[in-house]
Amino acid sequence: MENGYKNTMLPPEKRAEILLKEMSLDEKMAQVNGVFPFEDLFYDMKAIDAMMPFGIGEVSTLEMRRLEKLEDVAKWQKDVQEIVMKNSPHHIPAIFHMEGLCGAFIQDATSFPSGIGRASGWDPELEEQIAQVVSNQEAACGITHILAPVLDISRDSRMGRQGETYGEDPVLASALGSAYTKGIQEGEKAGRKTESVAKHFLAFHNSTAGTHSDTPPRLLQEIYAKPFQAAITEAGLKGIMPCYCSIDGVPASASYEILTKLLRDEMGFEGVCISDYGAVGNVHNVHHVGETAAEAGAMCMKAGMDIELPNTTGYNAELKKKFENGEEDSAILDALVLRVLTAKFRMGLFEHPFALQGEELKQAFYNEEARKISLRSAMESLVLLKNDGTLPLKKTMKKIAVIGPHANSARKFFGGYTHMCMVESTYAIENSIAGVSGCKNLENKEIVVVPGTNIQSDETEEFDRILKVQKPECRSLLEELQMQYPETEFIYAYGYPIAGEDESGFEEALQAIEEADAAILTLGGKHGTCSMASMGEGIDASDINLPGCQDKFIFAASKLKKPLIG
């Protein structure tokens, strides 16, 4: 039997205590930092090696989105983990993290509807099954921190990120969030235990410009903290990601009141607290707290922020020096490292650090049951707001017009935080996702925009190719209708774009409706995280109306007195 921290018979906490006593200051600082190999760095193992000379706490896997073969995903994780363990004096493996809201950003992973869509179904049992699929697929690739559920209570539909949430009701968010957390954390997958990281703690959607929140204590606890409390109490939530905003003038990432007194002492949270991307740096650069980034980093550590992501800003060499010379109490750092190590032992990473290979890997992905769960979730997300006798359509109808930019492209089915969206953003002239810069794939190429707007169009060859690679079997609405109803003639017309006032397609579309027995209109914008989206992270709205061109088209189409479905 192994002695010391390698003894698997000891509880994770005890193993962590033993290992902590053996570690140097350099190795401890490595454990509270993350690394994000972005763009070209993702493929450069020598550069990745140089980024973590003493190992690392966490590794971002966002750029796995670029890999078009599942086997390459597993190989990348294994190669990077080997570097981490080689460089760490005690061969401590890294936690690999990935988003989990709509499925993994991995080739052949199962995709799911957004949080707001799944909330429409109010089905905790299904939510737990979704989480189990996400957990199985990410764990197979060596990923054990899953950045979901999104437990923000969102009461203003102009907020671009509302689509990620379960909506405005804390009871609903509590039920679904707890179910999702259970699905992620229960049982072992590939010899490992995955852990859920709920976000964004706290009252993020009750802030002004995502920066400052004036939320009274009672509202904070009874509404905004309720889903987090439920996940902690009912599902044993092991991970928290604080929000970017300040609460009553104090950045959440640097707030002892929020991250320790409320979260740990009152709510009973015992897991790991990791920063949102760039949040520790934002304490200094955006909120203007602390004379230096290191001082802001020290404040975040004292507040209870265990790991800085995605790269080192505040938990830096200057802060290390402060621990070295006694300016800062090393017991603060030790408390953080102890929680990180405990999580790694709890996850089983010391015994199972690498992604699966071969058939074992494929079994987690090529799974008919996962597809059925995805379909059921999509069906339950549908809401019929009004029906004045138009539905179901009469069988005597022989010709139906299908109008709108979403109808002839399956790309627009995939909103923010889906794999499709993240791959699309590698061809975006600008990223709106926090902590991630714009990409270079379209440099020196002519950029097509939605007429009359600054929104980059996805109706080009590059994005057609992405769909064929990502979801080769995914049919558009028009294709599905034609397949399901071969006896009916469907007339397609583009009609109008996802935003703006362009009316150039009206004549053709109105003519199609005039010739048809009924018309199906696809309405709304495109949800995402980059310059191709009309709503999403970093892309808010001034109102909740449809785009002007779509409003005008509906008014014009209604004059034709044909049944309209939108």
Predicted segments with their positions:
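Glycoside hydrolase catalytic-domain context in secreted enzymes
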Residues: 1-566
